[in-house]
């Protein structure tokens, strides 16, 4: 089991660090009182391998509880529980700028100067910083660069390379655009199998409907251009730290055209080695509701 304790200065990026660890498959807990670390560790180690990666954020917000951290770490060591400490640091100038931009008060100086709070916090965290296995100074790091630094230390390289999970989702506009869509494409300009008597009762998953939709030059031009666009977008989304991408393709009812196109895009992405899922949200919606136009 990999057990990471994330700590550091307020404003240095602990929140972003824990999000990055969560993206890497860590079970994450924010602001756990240090006195609870031993019991939490025991519970996790008793899961018989179900939980393999854990990250805890421990910081000065714990107040007097933070002083119990070293006793808890001593207990972990004595009991044979392996752990790592990640310490997030930044310069005074950068921390002051971040606090002013966010209009937040420093936890150790809520009614005073930010610099005084930073100084007090540095003093209290000096020992834990000295014990840290990894220290990341975020003064010059953008969010993406911090994420990359976290990935470099804690990620599994094959996991990092394939971490963008893509979902291709077909839907019907009359049932509403999926709220979690990242990209939405309207294919209602394509010829509609609904008006072909022998195809109406089938869906875009059926070969006869798919063959009909894909038989038109306009369809193939659209699919080719969409695939080229995705070839450009996907690596750039990943570069900026995106880890999930939902591509929604809609027609009127979500049963014929959108399903056929979604399947074509899914197969194309899959053939290129992407981690991709397919979902046809409304494929049976009009059957259940007795709707007409698809």
UniProtKB/Swiss-Prot annotation:
Residues annotated for GTP binding in this entry: 59-62
Name recorded for this polypeptide: Nucleotide-binding protein CBO3377/CLC_3320
GO MF entry, a single one: ATP binding
Binding residues for ATP: 8-15
Family label: Belongs to the RapZ-like family.
Provenance organism: Clostridium botulinum (strain Hall / ATCC 3502 / NCTC 13319 / Type A)
Top-rank taxon, per record: Bacteria
Alphabetically ordered keywords of this record: ATP-binding, GTP-binding, Nucleotide-binding
Role noted for this protein: Displays ATPase and GTPase activities.
SS bonds (residue pairs): none
InterPro entries assigned to the protein according to its UniProt record, in alphabetical order: P-loop_NTPase, RapZ-like, RapZ-like_N, RapZ_C
Source species taxonomy: Bacteria, Bacillati, Bacillota, Clostridia, Eubacteriales
């Amino acid at each position: 089991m990999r057990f990471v304790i994330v700590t550091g200065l307020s404003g240095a990026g602990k929140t972003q660090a824990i999000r990055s660890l969560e993206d890497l498959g860590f079970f994450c807990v924010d602001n756990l009182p240090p006195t609870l670390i031993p019991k939490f560790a025991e519970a996790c180690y008793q899961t018989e391998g179900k939980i393999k990666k854990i990250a805890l954020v421990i910081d000065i917000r714990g107040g007097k509880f933070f002083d119990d951290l070293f006793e808890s770490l001593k207990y972990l060591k004595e009991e044979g529980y392996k752990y790592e400490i990640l310490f997030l640091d930044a310069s005074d100038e950068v921390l002051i700028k971040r606090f002013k931009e966010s209009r937040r008060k420093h936890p150790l100086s809520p009614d005073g100067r930010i610099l005084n709070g930073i100084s007090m916090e540095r003093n209290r965290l000096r020992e834990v910083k000295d014990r840290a296995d990894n220290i990341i100074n975020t003064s010059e790091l953008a969010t993406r660069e911090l994420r990359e630094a976290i990935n470099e230390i804690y990620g599994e390289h094959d996991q990092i390379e394939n971490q963008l999970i893509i979902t291709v989702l077909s839907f019907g506009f009359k049932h509403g655009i999926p709220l979690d869509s990242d990209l939405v494409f309207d294919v209602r300009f394509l010829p509609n199998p609904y008006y072909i008597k022998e195809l109406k009762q089938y869906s875009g998953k059926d070969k006869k409907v798919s063959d009909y939709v894909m038989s038109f030059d306009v369809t193939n031009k659209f699919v080719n251009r969409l695939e080229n666009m995705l070839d450009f977008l996907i690596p750039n989304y990943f570069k900026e730290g995106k880890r999930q991408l939902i591509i929604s393709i809609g027609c009127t009812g979500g049963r014929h055209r959108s399903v056929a196109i979604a399947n074509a895009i899914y197969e194309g992405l899959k053939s290129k080695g992407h981690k991709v899922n397919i979902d046809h949200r409304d494929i049976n919606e009009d059957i259940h509701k007795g709707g007409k136009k698809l």
